[in-house]
Structure formats: structure tokens, C-alpha cells
Amino acid sequence: MQAPIDHEQLTTWRDLSRIVELRMLAIYNADAAARQLILAQHGLTEINQADRQHDIELGHLMLEVFDRHFQLPALPDDVDVFALAMELGDRVYARSVQLHDEITPRMAEEGMRVFDAYLGLYLPVFLGKRTLLPLR
């Protein structure tokens, strides 16, 4: 999530969304134990709570990344839009793991579509890009 993103290559927020989701998929695909822990449905309350907290933290990071590159509109205070978008996409990935023991390319695409569809309820199609100052 914190790896550099080439700001000049971004045209719309959906470009950034795709980069972020592809990075998350790479993590899930590279580590079977993490994939099972994060995506498998399990009955352990402690694990579910830890997973939810992890999603909230990632949601905050994702908001910061999007806000760095685009001029975001006002978002609701009572719903963590980015965390919820990620959780919804994760449900699609989890379904793929349940059915196929992996995230198939088709279900990866569907998960990204769900992520974008939910964010699209809050982010207009065209967002102004920020002018990034060089990092020192």
C-alpha cells in the first residue's frame, strides 16, 4: 500500500483503485497462510475482530493514498467508505477461495469491480488530480 505510485500515470481515481487492488491481490496470492487467515470464513471471534481492525487501518491508509493523488469530495463521517469497499471486495475474493482454493483471475476482476462500484457511490467519475510536490 505504501509503495510508490507514479502520479503521472494516473488519469482517474479508478486507475489508482486498480493499482491498489492489484497490490492487495499480489499479497493474497503470494502467501497462502495470509490468504486463508484474511479471506477464509472462520468462527474465531478474535480473528474476525483483528481482521476488521486491519481493514479499518488499511481503509485509512487507502484514504490517505487517494487523497494524495486526487481532490476527494466530502465523505461520510459515520461510514469508513474505503474500509467498507475493501471488505466488500474481500468477500468476493473469499468466495473464490472457498470455491477454488485460490483467487481466480475471473473472481479477482469481480472483486475489483465490487470495490470500484462501491467507491463510485461516493467518488464522482472525474476527480481533480492534485499537483504533487517532489518528495525531499
Can you describe what each PLM-predicted range is?
Residues 2-29:
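Hydrophobic alpha-helical connector segments
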Residues 3-7, 37, 44, 68-72, ...:
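General structural signal for alpha-helix termini and helix-helix connectors
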Residues 10, 26-37, 41, 48, ...:
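Hydrophobic alpha-helical bundle segments that form small-molecule/ligand-binding pockets
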Residues 10-14, 18, 48, 79, ...:
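Short, structured helix-loop boundary elements
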Residues 12, 31, 100-104:
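Helix N-cap and loop-to-helix transition residues
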Residues 26, 60-68, 82-136:
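C-terminal peripheral helix-coil segments that are non-catalytic and often amphipathic
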Residues 49-51, 101:
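Short, solvent-exposed loop/turn segments at secondary-structure boundaries
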